[in-house]
Amino acid sequence: MLDDFFTRALIGGVGVALVAGPIGCFIIWRRLAYFGDTLSHSALLGIALALLLEINITLTVFLISVLVSFLLLLLQRRATLSSDALLGILAHSTLALGLVVLAFLTWVRVDLMGFLFGDILAVTAYDLATIWGGGIIALAVLSFIWNSLFAITVNYDLATAEGIKPEIINMIFTVIVAAVIAVSMKLVGVLLITALLIMPAATARRFSTSPEWMAVIAAVVGSISVLMGLNGSLEWDTPAGPSIVVAALLCFIVSLLPFPNLIKMKTRGFTRIANLPVKVKENDEAS
């Protein structure tokens, strides 16, 4: 019989993994790993401001992440620095500002390690409602913009010529990423959120034969990583958040073995066979 805290942690972790997987695919396709790091680092500033103003932490982290992402878009248009340089400036500036603000909160007892590396075992029923409610909304919006976002990812100019508005789609995607970071912050902490976005998607890439399958497999791999990580944390008394990331790393290492390519070849073979029956049956009837 599982303890209540473990069950809540598992339900919350799976909820985050189901959303982080598909979003992580676009982060990999668009090479936005450092962008994810920037938003996750800015989450600490959101936490500090929420504690200072005594308001909801999740909502504040979400708003700060959106603000930082829009600030990045603005700086990219006006500044002469490269995107990597701007991301580095924003990531480390917001992280440093967050730590400085927390240092001034002498009247508040702050669990800094919990914010940095997660405290999934302290997930409450309210957290579960936030994770699953926000996750469902994020997936619904992502499915709505999937084709447009994928078209922009593949060929920006062609997508623009077809009437798609890349700026609007990119802003919507940025808001989705910010929402995922806000709800998953308690799972693995602000320093490891990007790992939960990238590793399952990178693992799924080795097994998938289409973008949609990659998103599905990434969600499954993320869920498996959560289950493995929590079990390992319970068995060896290790931090839950880092344990989940280590489990995701093990899944990625397994994906580097040769058999994922064999699975992809077999899947393609089954797909080709499935496309043949009409002609084969006609030949059989004629004979």
PLM feature spans:
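Membrane-interfacial amphipathic/re-entrant helices at transmembrane-helix boundaries
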Residues: M1-L18
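Transmembrane helix-bundle core of multi-pass membrane transporters
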Residues: D4-R8, A79, L87-N147, V175
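Hydrophobic alpha-helical transmembrane segments
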Residues: L10-G15, T58-L63, G88-I89, L128-G133, ...
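Short loop segments and helix-boundary regions at transmembrane helix junctions
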Residues: C25-V108, A204-V216, S233-W236
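Small-residue-rich segments of transmembrane alpha-helices in multi-pass membrane proteins
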Residues: S42-L52, L90-L102, A122, P166-V177, ...
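Helix-loop-helix "hairpin" substructures at the membrane interface of multi-pass membrane proteins
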Residues: L128-L197
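Cytosolic-side transmembrane-helix boundaries in multi-pass membrane proteins
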Residues: T238-V245, L249-S287
